Amino acid sequence: MRYPAKQTTQWLKLVLGSLIIFFIAALMLFNPASLITSQQAKNDALIAESMAYHIGVSAYLYGYPLIDMTSQMHNETHLVEDNQDVYAPVNKLYRFNHLITPQTAGNLRAPNSDTLYFQGWYDITQQPLIIHTPDTQGRYFTIAITSLYAEVVHIGRRTTGTKERLFALVTPTWSGTLPDKVTPIVTETSKGWLLGRMLVTGSEDFVQANQLMEQIWLQPLGEFNGQPSNKKTEKINAQKYDFKGSLGFFAELNRTLKTLPLRPGEAALLAQFDEIGVGPNVTFDVDLLTPPQRKGLEHAIKDAEDIIQASTQRSIKSTNGWMISKDIGVYGYRYMHRASVVKGGYGNLPEESLYPAAVFDENGNLLNGSDRFRVHFNPEQLPPVDGFWSLSAYKLEDAQFEPNSIDRYSIGNLTKGLTYNELGGLTLDLQHEMPADTTTNWLPIPEGHFMLVMRLYEPKQNVLDNQWIPPSIERL
Protein backbone atom coordinates (compact mmCIF):
# COMPACT_ATOMS: atom_id res chain seq x y z
CA MET A 1 0.00 0.00 0.00
CA ARG A 2 1.27 3.44 -0.81
CA TYR A 3 0.64 6.38 1.55
CA PRO A 4 0.27 9.96 0.55
CA ALA A 5 3.45 11.99 0.77
CA LYS A 6 1.99 14.15 3.51
CA GLN A 7 1.25 11.15 5.73
CA THR A 8 4.73 9.71 5.12
CA THR A 9 6.34 12.96 6.18
CA GLN A 10 4.26 13.08 9.36
CA TRP A 11 5.16 9.45 10.14
CA LEU A 12 8.89 10.11 9.70
CA LYS A 13 8.68 13.13 11.97
CA LEU A 14 6.94 10.99 14.59
CA VAL A 15 9.57 8.23 14.38
CA LEU A 16 12.49 10.68 14.44
CA GLY A 17 10.98 12.51 17.37
CA SER A 18 10.60 9.27 19.30
CA LEU A 19 14.21 8.32 18.55
CA ILE A 20 15.45 11.71 19.70
CA ILE A 21 13.50 11.39 22.95
CA PHE A 22 14.89 7.84 23.40
CA PHE A 23 18.49 8.92 22.88
CA ILE A 24 18.11 11.90 25.20
CA ALA A 25 16.70 9.61 27.89
CA ALA A 26 19.50 7.09 27.32
CA LEU A 27 22.14 9.77 27.56
CA MET A 28 20.60 11.01 30.78
CA LEU A 29 20.78 7.48 32.21
CA PHE A 30 24.30 6.84 30.85
CA ASN A 31 25.98 9.81 32.63
CA PRO A 32 29.70 9.35 31.82
CA ALA A 33 30.63 11.44 34.85
CA SER A 34 29.33 8.74 37.19
CA LEU A 35 31.38 6.12 35.37
CA ILE A 36 34.50 8.25 35.66
CA THR A 37 33.85 8.77 39.38
CA SER A 38 33.37 5.04 39.94
CA GLN A 39 36.57 4.16 38.09
CA GLN A 40 38.49 6.84 39.97
CA ALA A 41 37.32 5.38 43.27
CA LYS A 42 38.61 1.97 42.23
CA ASN A 43 41.92 3.49 41.18
CA ASP A 44 42.24 5.37 44.47
CA ALA A 45 41.58 2.19 46.44
CA LEU A 46 44.13 0.27 44.39
CA ILE A 47 46.74 2.99 44.86
CA ALA A 48 46.08 3.15 48.62
CA GLU A 49 46.37 -0.61 48.98
CA SER A 50 49.51 -0.82 46.84
CA MET A 51 51.23 2.02 48.68
CA ALA A 52 50.37 0.51 52.05
CA TYR A 53 51.67 -2.86 50.90
CA HIS A 54 54.97 -1.79 49.35
CA ILE A 55 55.88 0.77 52.01
CA GLY A 56 54.59 -1.61 54.68
CA VAL A 57 57.01 -4.34 53.60
CA SER A 58 59.92 -1.88 53.77
CA ALA A 59 58.80 -0.60 57.17
CA TYR A 60 58.43 -4.11 58.56
CA LEU A 61 61.91 -5.15 57.42
CA TYR A 62 63.41 -1.90 58.70
CA GLY A 63 61.62 -2.00 62.02
CA TYR A 64 61.97 -5.70 62.80
CA PRO A 65 64.96 -5.37 65.18
CA LEU A 66 63.48 -2.29 66.86
CA ILE A 67 60.23 -4.04 67.71
CA ASP A 68 61.96 -7.29 68.63
CA MET A 69 64.17 -5.36 71.05
CA THR A 70 61.48 -3.13 72.56
CA SER A 71 59.18 -6.12 73.05
CA GLN A 72 61.88 -8.16 74.77
CA MET A 73 62.85 -5.17 76.86
CA HIS A 74 59.27 -4.79 78.09
CA ASN A 75 58.83 -8.52 78.69
CA GLU A 76 62.05 -8.91 80.70
CA THR A 77 61.78 -5.72 82.77
CA HIS A 78 58.18 -6.45 83.79
CA LEU A 79 56.53 -9.52 85.27
CA VAL A 80 54.51 -10.74 82.30
CA GLU A 81 53.98 -14.41 83.16
CA ASP A 82 54.12 -16.91 86.00
CA ASN A 83 57.49 -18.58 86.68
CA GLN A 84 59.24 -16.06 84.44
CA ASP A 85 62.77 -17.18 83.55
CA VAL A 86 64.41 -13.76 83.18
CA TYR A 87 63.46 -10.58 85.04
CA ALA A 88 65.36 -7.47 86.10
CA PRO A 89 64.26 -3.82 86.19
CA VAL A 90 65.65 -1.35 83.68
CA ASN A 91 69.32 -0.50 84.34
CA LYS A 92 69.77 -3.60 86.50
CA LEU A 93 71.45 -6.92 85.70
CA TYR A 94 70.01 -10.41 85.72
CA ARG A 95 72.68 -13.03 86.39
CA PHE A 96 72.57 -16.68 85.39
CA ASN A 97 74.44 -18.06 88.42
CA HIS A 98 74.99 -21.44 86.81
CA LEU A 99 76.48 -22.97 83.71
CA ILE A 100 73.95 -23.93 81.07
CA THR A 101 72.81 -27.55 81.12
CA PRO A 102 69.74 -29.26 79.63
CA GLN A 103 67.94 -28.50 82.89
CA THR A 104 68.85 -24.79 83.05
CA ALA A 105 68.83 -23.62 79.43
CA GLY A 106 65.38 -22.03 79.62
CA ASN A 107 64.61 -20.11 76.42
CA LEU A 108 68.24 -19.83 75.32
CA ARG A 109 68.93 -21.34 71.90
CA ALA A 110 72.27 -23.08 71.32
CA PRO A 111 73.72 -21.74 74.60
CA ASN A 112 77.35 -22.22 75.54
CA SER A 113 78.46 -24.11 78.64
CA ASP A 114 81.84 -22.36 78.91
CA THR A 115 80.72 -19.06 80.40
CA LEU A 116 78.31 -17.57 82.90
CA TYR A 117 75.75 -15.28 81.29
CA PHE A 118 74.46 -11.97 82.62
CA GLN A 119 72.21 -9.44 80.95
CA GLY A 120 70.28 -6.21 81.40
CA TRP A 121 68.23 -3.60 79.53
CA TYR A 122 69.42 -0.01 79.65
CA ASP A 123 67.60 3.30 79.33
CA ILE A 124 69.86 6.37 79.20
CA THR A 125 67.22 8.79 77.97
CA GLN A 126 67.61 10.98 81.06
CA GLN A 127 71.22 10.35 82.06
CA PRO A 128 74.22 8.08 81.37
CA LEU A 129 74.55 4.66 82.96
CA ILE A 130 77.70 3.73 84.87
CA ILE A 131 79.06 0.21 84.27
CA HIS A 132 81.59 -1.24 86.72
CA THR A 133 83.81 -4.19 85.76
CA PRO A 134 86.24 -5.84 88.21
CA ASP A 135 89.84 -6.89 87.76
CA THR A 136 89.50 -10.37 86.26
CA GLN A 137 93.28 -10.88 86.20
CA GLY A 138 93.33 -11.82 82.55
CA ARG A 139 90.17 -13.95 82.64
CA TYR A 140 88.09 -13.69 79.50
CA PHE A 141 84.86 -11.71 79.76
CA THR A 142 82.85 -9.60 77.39
CA ILE A 143 79.78 -7.37 77.45
CA ALA A 144 77.99 -6.85 74.15
CA ILE A 145 76.10 -3.54 74.09
CA THR A 146 73.39 -3.81 71.45
CA SER A 147 71.39 -0.80 70.24
CA LEU A 148 67.79 -1.00 69.06
CA TYR A 149 69.21 -1.12 65.53
CA ALA A 150 71.14 -4.31 66.52
CA GLU A 151 74.49 -2.53 66.16
CA VAL A 152 77.05 -3.83 68.68
CA VAL A 153 79.96 -2.41 70.66
CA HIS A 154 81.97 -4.37 73.23
CA ILE A 155 83.42 -3.93 76.69
CA GLY A 156 85.75 -6.71 77.78
CA ARG A 157 89.15 -8.29 77.63
CA ARG A 158 89.66 -7.77 73.90
CA THR A 159 88.59 -4.12 73.77
CA THR A 160 89.11 -2.57 77.20
CA GLY A 161 91.31 -5.03 79.11
CA THR A 162 90.74 -6.89 82.36
CA LYS A 163 91.75 -4.30 84.99
CA GLU A 164 89.02 -2.81 87.17
CA ARG A 165 87.25 -0.15 85.11
CA LEU A 166 84.35 2.30 85.18
CA PHE A 167 82.45 3.13 82.00
CA ALA A 168 79.54 5.42 81.22
CA LEU A 169 77.04 4.46 78.56
CA VAL A 170 76.10 7.69 76.73
CA THR A 171 74.18 8.75 73.63
CA PRO A 172 75.97 10.54 70.76
CA THR A 173 74.34 13.86 71.73
CA TRP A 174 75.09 13.78 75.46
CA SER A 175 77.39 16.65 76.46
CA GLY A 176 77.68 16.48 80.24
CA THR A 177 80.69 15.85 82.48
CA LEU A 178 81.71 12.43 83.79
CA PRO A 179 83.57 11.70 87.04
CA ASP A 180 87.30 11.09 86.90
CA LYS A 181 88.44 7.73 85.54
CA VAL A 182 85.08 7.01 83.92
CA THR A 183 85.38 6.13 80.23
CA PRO A 184 82.46 7.02 77.93
CA ILE A 185 81.02 4.30 75.69
CA VAL A 186 78.78 5.72 72.96
CA THR A 187 75.71 3.75 71.93
CA GLU A 188 73.48 4.80 69.07
CA THR A 189 70.13 4.56 70.85
CA SER A 190 69.07 5.58 74.34
CA LYS A 191 67.63 2.11 74.97
CA GLY A 192 69.16 -1.29 74.33
CA TRP A 193 70.49 -4.55 75.65
CA LEU A 194 73.58 -5.69 77.54
CA LEU A 195 74.63 -9.34 77.28
CA GLY A 196 77.72 -10.46 79.16
CA ARG A 197 79.79 -13.64 79.42
CA MET A 198 82.30 -14.61 82.12
CA LEU A 199 84.61 -17.56 81.43
CA VAL A 200 84.50 -20.60 83.73
CA THR A 201 87.55 -22.84 83.28
CA GLY A 202 86.14 -25.83 85.20
CA SER A 203 84.01 -26.93 88.14
CA GLU A 204 86.70 -25.85 90.61
CA ASP A 205 86.61 -22.35 89.09
CA PHE A 206 82.86 -21.88 89.31
CA VAL A 207 82.75 -20.02 92.65
CA GLN A 208 85.44 -17.52 91.68
CA ALA A 209 83.83 -16.85 88.30
CA ASN A 210 80.52 -16.19 90.03
CA GLN A 211 82.16 -13.80 92.49
CA LEU A 212 83.67 -11.83 89.62
CA MET A 213 80.35 -11.71 87.79
CA GLU A 214 78.67 -10.34 90.94
CA GLN A 215 81.16 -7.43 90.86
CA ILE A 216 79.82 -6.23 87.52
CA TRP A 217 77.11 -3.69 88.28
CA LEU A 218 75.13 -0.81 86.77
CA GLN A 219 74.19 2.55 88.27
CA PRO A 220 72.63 5.74 86.83
CA LEU A 221 75.10 8.62 86.85
CA GLY A 222 72.96 10.67 89.24
CA GLU A 223 73.16 7.90 91.87
CA PHE A 224 76.82 7.06 91.35
CA ASN A 225 78.98 6.97 94.49
CA GLY A 226 81.57 4.38 93.50
CA GLN A 227 79.73 1.51 95.15
CA PRO A 228 76.98 -0.84 93.93
CA SER A 229 73.50 0.23 94.94
CA ASN A 230 71.31 -1.86 97.24
CA LYS A 231 68.28 0.20 96.34
CA LYS A 232 65.18 -1.97 96.04
CA THR A 233 63.09 -1.63 92.92
CA GLU A 234 59.38 -2.36 92.89
CA LYS A 235 58.40 -5.20 90.59
CA ILE A 236 55.87 -4.24 87.95
CA ASN A 237 53.27 -6.59 86.52
CA ALA A 238 52.25 -6.04 82.91
CA GLN A 239 50.77 -7.68 79.85
CA LYS A 240 53.22 -9.46 77.59
CA TYR A 241 54.18 -7.64 74.38
CA ASP A 242 54.07 -9.53 71.10
CA PHE A 243 53.51 -7.24 68.13
CA LYS A 244 54.97 -9.38 65.37
CA GLY A 245 52.49 -10.47 62.75
CA SER A 246 49.85 -7.88 63.67
CA LEU A 247 49.02 -4.27 62.85
CA GLY A 248 50.17 -3.46 66.37
CA PHE A 249 53.69 -3.83 64.96
CA PHE A 250 53.28 -0.60 62.99
CA ALA A 251 51.81 1.26 65.97
CA GLU A 252 54.78 0.25 68.13
CA LEU A 253 57.23 1.09 65.35
CA ASN A 254 55.65 4.53 65.03
CA ARG A 255 55.98 5.13 68.79
CA THR A 256 59.58 3.91 68.80
CA LEU A 257 60.70 5.98 65.80
CA LYS A 258 59.43 9.13 67.51
CA THR A 259 61.96 8.54 70.31
CA LEU A 260 65.00 7.98 68.07
CA PRO A 261 67.26 10.53 66.36
CA LEU A 262 67.28 10.57 62.58
CA ARG A 263 70.07 8.37 61.24
CA PRO A 264 72.23 9.77 58.42
CA GLY A 265 70.88 8.89 55.00
CA GLU A 266 67.47 7.68 56.18
CA ALA A 267 65.36 10.84 55.89
CA ALA A 268 63.83 9.87 52.54
CA LEU A 269 62.99 6.36 53.74
CA LEU A 270 61.27 7.58 56.89
CA ALA A 271 59.39 10.17 54.84
CA GLN A 272 57.93 7.25 52.88
CA PHE A 273 56.92 5.64 56.17
CA ASP A 274 55.06 8.86 56.99
CA GLU A 275 52.90 8.26 53.90
CA ILE A 276 51.28 5.23 55.56
CA GLY A 277 51.20 6.72 59.06
CA VAL A 278 54.20 4.83 60.42
CA GLY A 279 57.02 7.39 60.19
CA PRO A 280 58.19 9.59 63.08
CA ASN A 281 56.42 12.75 61.87
CA VAL A 282 52.89 11.33 62.06
CA THR A 283 50.83 9.26 64.48
CA PHE A 284 49.66 5.79 63.51
CA ASP A 285 46.04 4.99 64.34
CA VAL A 286 44.79 1.62 63.21
CA ASP A 287 41.17 2.79 63.53
CA LEU A 288 41.74 5.49 60.91
CA LEU A 289 43.00 3.08 58.26
CA THR A 290 40.81 2.76 55.19
CA PRO A 291 39.86 -0.79 54.16
CA PRO A 292 42.39 -0.71 51.26
CA GLN A 293 45.17 0.51 53.58
CA ARG A 294 44.39 -2.17 56.14
CA LYS A 295 44.36 -4.84 53.44
CA GLY A 296 47.70 -3.65 52.08
CA LEU A 297 49.39 -3.56 55.49
CA GLU A 298 48.07 -6.99 56.49
CA HIS A 299 49.40 -8.41 53.22
CA ALA A 300 52.72 -6.62 53.84
CA ILE A 301 53.10 -8.21 57.28
CA LYS A 302 52.65 -11.72 55.91
CA ASP A 303 55.01 -11.24 52.98
CA ALA A 304 57.66 -9.47 55.08
CA GLU A 305 57.65 -12.33 57.59
CA ASP A 306 58.04 -14.79 54.70
CA ILE A 307 60.91 -12.73 53.28
CA ILE A 308 62.72 -12.69 56.63
CA GLN A 309 62.23 -16.42 57.12
CA ALA A 310 63.45 -17.18 53.61
CA SER A 311 66.45 -14.93 54.14
CA THR A 312 67.47 -16.85 57.27
CA GLN A 313 67.43 -20.05 55.23
CA ARG A 314 69.61 -18.77 52.42
CA SER A 315 72.57 -21.06 52.09
CA ILE A 316 75.75 -19.81 53.72
CA LYS A 317 78.86 -20.92 51.90
CA SER A 318 80.34 -23.89 53.70
CA THR A 319 83.83 -25.35 53.66
CA ASN A 320 84.57 -28.82 55.01
CA GLY A 321 80.90 -28.87 55.99
CA TRP A 322 81.24 -25.81 58.27
CA MET A 323 79.19 -22.67 57.79
CA ILE A 324 80.72 -19.46 59.14
CA SER A 325 78.85 -16.15 59.24
CA LYS A 326 81.09 -13.11 59.72
CA ASP A 327 78.56 -10.46 58.78
CA ILE A 328 77.03 -9.70 62.18
CA GLY A 329 76.87 -6.69 64.48
CA VAL A 330 77.28 -3.89 61.91
CA TYR A 331 74.57 -3.55 59.24
CA GLY A 332 74.31 0.01 57.95
CA TYR A 333 71.53 0.17 55.35
CA ARG A 334 71.18 -3.62 54.84
CA TYR A 335 67.79 -3.87 56.47
CA MET A 336 66.77 -7.31 55.20
CA HIS A 337 70.07 -8.84 56.30
CA ARG A 338 69.73 -7.18 59.69
CA ALA A 339 66.20 -8.56 60.11
CA SER A 340 67.26 -12.07 59.12
CA VAL A 341 70.10 -12.07 61.66
CA VAL A 342 67.82 -10.77 64.42
CA LYS A 343 65.30 -13.49 63.57
CA GLY A 344 67.86 -16.01 64.81
CA GLY A 345 69.22 -13.91 67.68
CA TYR A 346 71.79 -11.23 68.40
CA GLY A 347 75.49 -11.84 68.01
CA ASN A 348 78.91 -10.49 68.86
CA LEU A 349 81.13 -8.76 66.38
CA PRO A 350 83.24 -11.34 64.51
CA GLU A 351 86.40 -9.90 66.09
CA GLU A 352 84.96 -10.91 69.46
CA SER A 353 83.74 -14.39 68.59
CA LEU A 354 82.90 -16.60 65.63
CA TYR A 355 80.63 -19.63 65.53
CA PRO A 356 81.35 -22.16 62.77
CA ALA A 357 78.34 -24.51 62.60
CA ALA A 358 77.75 -27.83 60.86
CA VAL A 359 74.78 -30.13 60.27
CA PHE A 360 76.42 -32.32 57.60
CA ASP A 361 79.47 -34.56 57.60
CA GLU A 362 82.26 -34.43 55.02
CA ASN A 363 80.12 -36.40 52.54
CA GLY A 364 77.06 -34.16 52.83
CA ASN A 365 75.03 -36.50 55.07
CA LEU A 366 73.03 -35.13 58.00
CA LEU A 367 74.77 -35.63 61.31
CA ASN A 368 73.02 -38.30 63.37
CA GLY A 369 73.90 -39.79 66.74
CA SER A 370 73.35 -43.32 65.48
CA ASP A 371 76.81 -42.98 63.89
CA ARG A 372 80.24 -42.19 65.32
CA PHE A 373 82.31 -39.23 64.13
CA ARG A 374 85.79 -37.85 64.48
CA VAL A 375 87.24 -34.35 64.14
CA HIS A 376 91.03 -34.33 63.85
CA PHE A 377 93.18 -31.21 64.14
CA ASN A 378 96.71 -31.37 62.86
CA PRO A 379 99.05 -29.24 65.01
CA GLU A 380 98.84 -26.36 62.51
CA GLN A 381 95.03 -26.74 62.34
CA LEU A 382 94.29 -26.11 66.01
CA PRO A 383 91.92 -23.14 66.24
CA PRO A 384 93.95 -19.89 66.26
CA VAL A 385 92.45 -17.77 69.05
CA ASP A 386 93.64 -15.27 71.62
CA GLY A 387 90.80 -16.27 73.92
CA PHE A 388 89.63 -19.88 73.90
CA TRP A 389 87.74 -22.31 71.71
CA SER A 390 85.21 -25.08 72.26
CA LEU A 391 82.92 -27.47 70.40
CA SER A 392 79.32 -28.27 71.41
CA ALA A 393 76.59 -30.55 70.06
CA TYR A 394 72.86 -29.71 70.06
CA LYS A 395 69.67 -31.49 69.12
CA LEU A 396 68.82 -30.28 65.65
CA GLU A 397 65.10 -29.78 66.27
CA ASP A 398 65.42 -27.27 69.12
CA ALA A 399 69.13 -26.33 69.43
CA GLN A 400 69.24 -27.63 73.01
CA PHE A 401 71.66 -29.89 74.85
CA GLU A 402 70.77 -33.53 75.45
CA PRO A 403 71.66 -35.04 78.85
CA ASN A 404 74.66 -37.37 78.89
CA SER A 405 76.37 -39.66 81.39
CA ILE A 406 79.39 -37.41 82.10
CA ASP A 407 77.58 -34.03 82.01
CA ARG A 408 79.91 -32.73 79.31
CA TYR A 409 78.36 -30.23 76.90
CA SER A 410 81.47 -28.75 75.35
CA ILE A 411 85.04 -29.75 74.69
CA GLY A 412 87.96 -27.51 73.79
CA ASN A 413 91.38 -26.19 74.68
CA LEU A 414 90.33 -25.52 78.29
CA THR A 415 88.98 -29.04 78.85
CA LYS A 416 91.04 -30.77 81.54
CA GLY A 417 92.92 -33.92 80.52
CA LEU A 418 92.72 -33.71 76.73
CA THR A 419 95.13 -36.11 75.04
CA TYR A 420 97.24 -34.81 72.14
CA ASN A 421 99.32 -37.05 69.88
CA GLU A 422 103.12 -36.99 69.80
CA LEU A 423 103.12 -34.30 67.09
CA GLY A 424 100.71 -32.04 68.98
CA GLY A 425 97.62 -32.95 66.98
CA LEU A 426 94.21 -33.44 68.59
CA THR A 427 91.44 -35.92 67.77
CA LEU A 428 87.95 -35.44 69.21
CA ASP A 429 85.60 -38.44 69.44
CA LEU A 430 81.96 -37.60 68.77
CA GLN A 431 79.45 -40.35 69.60
CA HIS A 432 76.30 -40.98 71.61
CA GLU A 433 77.49 -44.02 73.56
CA MET A 434 80.46 -43.85 75.92
CA PRO A 435 83.70 -44.99 74.24
CA ALA A 436 85.04 -48.34 75.39
CA ASP A 437 88.59 -47.14 76.04
CA THR A 438 88.71 -43.55 77.30
CA THR A 439 86.48 -40.50 77.67
CA THR A 440 89.19 -37.84 77.76
CA ASN A 441 88.58 -36.64 74.19
CA TRP A 442 84.90 -37.61 74.04
CA LEU A 443 82.13 -35.15 73.23
CA PRO A 444 78.75 -36.85 73.78
CA ILE A 445 76.29 -36.17 70.95
CA PRO A 446 72.46 -36.42 70.86
CA GLU A 447 70.88 -39.70 69.84
CA GLY A 448 69.16 -38.32 66.73
CA HIS A 449 69.96 -35.55 64.26
CA PHE A 450 72.23 -32.92 65.73
CA MET A 451 74.30 -29.87 64.88
CA LEU A 452 77.79 -28.88 65.93
CA VAL A 453 78.79 -25.36 66.93
CA MET A 454 82.43 -24.38 67.36
CA ARG A 455 83.11 -21.23 69.37
CA LEU A 456 86.19 -19.16 68.67
CA TYR A 457 86.61 -16.36 71.22
CA GLU A 458 88.96 -13.59 70.11
CA PRO A 459 89.78 -15.30 66.80
CA LYS A 460 93.08 -14.35 65.23
CA GLN A 461 93.31 -12.42 61.99
CA ASN A 462 93.88 -15.48 59.81
CA VAL A 463 90.45 -16.75 60.89
CA LEU A 464 88.81 -13.44 60.01
CA ASP A 465 90.62 -13.48 56.65
CA ASN A 466 89.33 -16.99 55.81
CA GLN A 467 92.84 -18.43 55.87
CA TRP A 468 91.84 -20.96 58.55
CA ILE A 469 88.84 -23.29 58.46
CA PRO A 470 87.86 -26.14 60.80
CA PRO A 471 88.75 -29.68 59.71
CA SER A 472 86.09 -31.90 58.17
CA ILE A 473 83.76 -34.09 60.23
CA GLU A 474 84.61 -37.71 59.50
CA ARG A 475 81.95 -40.41 59.82
CA LEU A 476 83.50 -43.64 61.14
Please report, for each region that a protein language model flagged, where it lies by residue:
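Active-site-proximal segment of zinc-dependent metalloprotease catalytic domains
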Residues: 1
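N-terminal Sec-pathway targeting helices
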Residues: 4-21
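Hydrophobic core
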Residues: 23-28
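A compositional/structural signature for long, glycine/proline-rich flexible linkers
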Residues: 29-476
